């Protein structure tokens, strides 16, 4: 049996959709229908926060950037809420190109960065890319 994959080669992406009522439904929307929503991003933010807290044994700092896609405000809000629930300090870089997030991670001395975008995908899609403390794209163990 093939296990569904949540994280692709360049982050998590999908069509922006409304948030379902439960965390499980939100994650199933990504895995089975490739739909992203604020609730799923809250769960993702919480998971990232827990991983960082375990690795760093402190209150990690994460910088979030995003592009102008409709629906990104909902996704950023979800990530922020999830990170805060794991005691992560969040800095919003605001609307920035993906290479700008690299600079924001380094400039703020953050432990990680999250870029909410879907790059070249249609404007109805969005997602999140992960950056490590050196501003490099990485593949967190989610």
Show where each model-derived region lies:
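Short, intrinsically disordered, charge-balanced linker/junction segments flanking boundaries
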Residues: 140-142
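Ferredoxin-reductase
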Residues: 55-137
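An N-terminal, well-structured beta->alpha segment
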Residues: 1-79, 85-86
């Amino acid at each position: 049996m093939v296990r569904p994959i949540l994280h692709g080669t360049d982050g998590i992406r999908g069509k922006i959709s409304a948030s379902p009522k439960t965390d499980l439904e939100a994650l199933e929307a990504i895995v089975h229908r490739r739909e992203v929503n604020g609730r799923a991003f809250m769960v993702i933010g919480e998971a990232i926060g827990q991983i960082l807290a375990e690795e760093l044994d402190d209150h990690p700092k994460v910088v979030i950037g995003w592009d102008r896609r409709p629906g990104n405000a909902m996704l950023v809000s979800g990530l922020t809420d999830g990170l805060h629930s794991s005691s992560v300090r969040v800095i919003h870089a605001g609307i920035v190109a993906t290479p700008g997030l690299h600079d924001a991670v380094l400039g703020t001395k953050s432990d990680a960065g999250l870029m909410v975008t879907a790059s070249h995908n249609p404007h109805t899609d969005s997602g999140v890319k992960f950056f490590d403390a050196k501003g490099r794209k990485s593949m967190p163990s989610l």
